[in-house]
Amino acid sequence: ASPLPDDVTIATKFGSLSRTHLPDGTAVCLNANSTLTYSPAMNGKGTRNVMLQGEAYFEVKADAEHPFKVNTPYMTVTATGTEFNVNAYDSSASVTLINGRVNVGVENQSMTLNPSEHLSLADGRAVINGHIDTEKYCCWKDGMLIFDDEPLVNICNRLQQMYDVEFDVAPELASLTF
């Protein structure tokens, strides 16, 4: 769905973050090279839908009557009041749940995440990992990155997404982990 003329769009450049509160009271931290679009009429009396391209951390204001939906090109995340991170830079999108509960819709599937669970898409399939260190996926909002046993090529891709830098990694080094 494309934005309507009255919709508000927040966009961040490489190397920058944006923190904002939506009209319904939800707090959002938008990562570098990301775009968030929402209706200025999203005031808790109707639908609470946003569109995300990139990455954002959400602290959703509780409202069981009006679910909060994050629509990305790869999945839809639905919450009624919770904290979670959505990474939707590319088709290897992911959701990390800090607290509360969210439903994630991927194609014809719907899955529920519980606190400290991480859902990632790989080759069009959803994989859920439980009891993860949520800080690894959310520390970017505090100006940090954590890598643990991560292939060098993945680290370089993450840095490229955030800082618009290019790396030329020799094939024999690509799978080294850090």
Which residues does each predicted region cover?
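A residue-level detector for the "anchor" residue at the start of short, highly conserved motifs
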Residues: 1-178
